[in-house]
């Protein structure tokens, strides 16, 4: 059951949550007023000044982070996926993040969309911001990791968080200029225990693309096919755009992807328009390179800079055609780029790396 906002932009706490807060700090009830039998409203005016629980509890949590008492802290990862659909990339992303946080010593729970507001004791919320907004509880440390759909997040929403991580250096720099809350760049990453090199001859394809259409004929596939290249495609919705003999399947399980990535000669990658415009590099780039895969991607700056030029990008259909032909005929060049890219990812872009970055950033936060 989700919290709501009323007309005066006050935060609504449902009765069970209110009772929990009241028990922890009886003084808080003076800041609450009844609206009906099911809801209590806490005034949003000078939020941190009025919420006595937040005033004292957040510094205690921060002190434990600074002193590395991670085993005394519980982290809730708010995953955007619904319980009924665990094929979303967010679901696997959440579990990889959980594993790395637990290695660090934290107690970690994953809350899928329907369980975001369950009555559980939490110290730190890490919200993987995708399609839906999360209405935060101010007595906990709240972290947003904006990994997709940046066009759907307002400045007002960002400002409610103690720290905001953005999976794009370009967008993070834009937000730093106009937000008061702390903003840091935190790119996506990979789990090398899930994505690693493992070639299988029966999965060897010249050119592979994995992804759904969302009712859009994705440009990199369109450009490749119109130039006469044979692309093996896995994903939902392609019947509308291409011959069925090119469609190899609708879905590859996440724990099988590494075999397909490792075995193909060229993996094609692209970005949705909002991600490309704001330079959010796809998680597929990290996963594929961890498998030692050669990748050609649409042209975004971070695809080149993050991986030291070991991702090949293209400008238009003619450029793509030339690069596909060249690299199919030069396996040594493919392997050289893939090997260097893998080394960069394993050294710099794993979930363990990102958890270290998150913890160091949390140590520096201040409560406004």
Label each residue range with its predicted role.
Residues 12-138, 163, 171-178, 184-185, ...:
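N-terminal pre-catalytic "stem/leader" segment of glycosyltransferase-like enzymes
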Residues 70, 75-83, 91, 95-96, ...:
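Catalytic binding pocket for nucleotide-activated donors in carbohydrate/polymer assembly enzymes
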Residues 86-92, 99, 192-263, 272-276:
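Conserved catalytic-core segment of nucleotide-activated headgroup transferases in glycan assembly
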Residues 118, 156-157, 259-260:
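Structural alpha-helical scaffold elements that stabilize or flank donor/cofactor-binding regions
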Residues 121, 160, 262-263:
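Alpha-helix C-terminal capping/helix-to-coil transition sites in glycosyltransferase folds
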Residues 135-230, 238-239, 350, 355:
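Catalytic core of nucleotide-activated saccharide and alditol-phosphate transferases
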């Amino acid at each position: 059951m989700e919290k709501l906002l009323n007309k005066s932009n006050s935060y609504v706490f449902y009765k069970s949550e209110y009772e929990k807060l009241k028990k922890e700090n009886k003084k808080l009830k003076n800041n609450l007023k009844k609206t009906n039998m099911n809801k209590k409203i806490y005034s949003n005016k000078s939020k941190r000044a009025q919420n006595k629980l937040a005033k004292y509890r957040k510094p205690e949590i921060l002190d434990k982070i600074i002193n590395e008492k991670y085993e005394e802290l519980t982290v809730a990862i708010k995953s955007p996926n619904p319980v009924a659909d665990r094929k979303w990339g967010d679901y696997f992303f959440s579990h990889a993040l959980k594993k790395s946080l637990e290695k660090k010593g934290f107690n970690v729970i994953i809350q899928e969309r329907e369980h975001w507001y369950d009555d559980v004791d939490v110290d730190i919320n890490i919200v993987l911001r995708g399609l839906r907004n999360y209405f935060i509880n101010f007595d906990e440390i709240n972290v947003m990791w904006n990994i997709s759909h940046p066009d759907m997040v307002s400045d007002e929403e960002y400002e409610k968080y103690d720290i905001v991580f953005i999976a794009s250096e370009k967008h993070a720099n834009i937000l730093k200029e106009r937000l008061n809350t702390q903003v840091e760049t935190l790119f996506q990453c990979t789990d090398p225990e899930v994505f690693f090199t493992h070639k299988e001859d029966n999965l060897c394809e010249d050119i592979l693309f994995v992804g759904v259409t969302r009712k859009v004929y994705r440009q990199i596939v369109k450009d490749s096919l119109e130039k006469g290249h044979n692309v093996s495609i896995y994903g939902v919705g392609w019947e509308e755009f291409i011959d069925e003999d090119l469609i190899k399947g609708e879905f590859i399980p996440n724990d099988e992807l590494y075999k397909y990535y490792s075995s193909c000669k060229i993996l094609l990658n692209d970005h949705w328009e909002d991600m490309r415009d704001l330079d959010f590099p796809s998680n597929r780039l990290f996963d594929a390179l961890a498998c030692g895969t050669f990748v050609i991607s649409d042209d975004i700056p971070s695809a080149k800079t993050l991986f030291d030029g070991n991702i090949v990008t293209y400008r238009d259909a003619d450029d793509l055609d030339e690069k596909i032909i060249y690299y199919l005929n030069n396996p040594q060049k493919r392997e050289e780029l893939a090997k260097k890219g893998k080394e960069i990812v394993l050294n710099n872009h794993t979930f363990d790396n990102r958890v270290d970055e998150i913890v160091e950033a949390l140590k520096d936060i201040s409560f406004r």
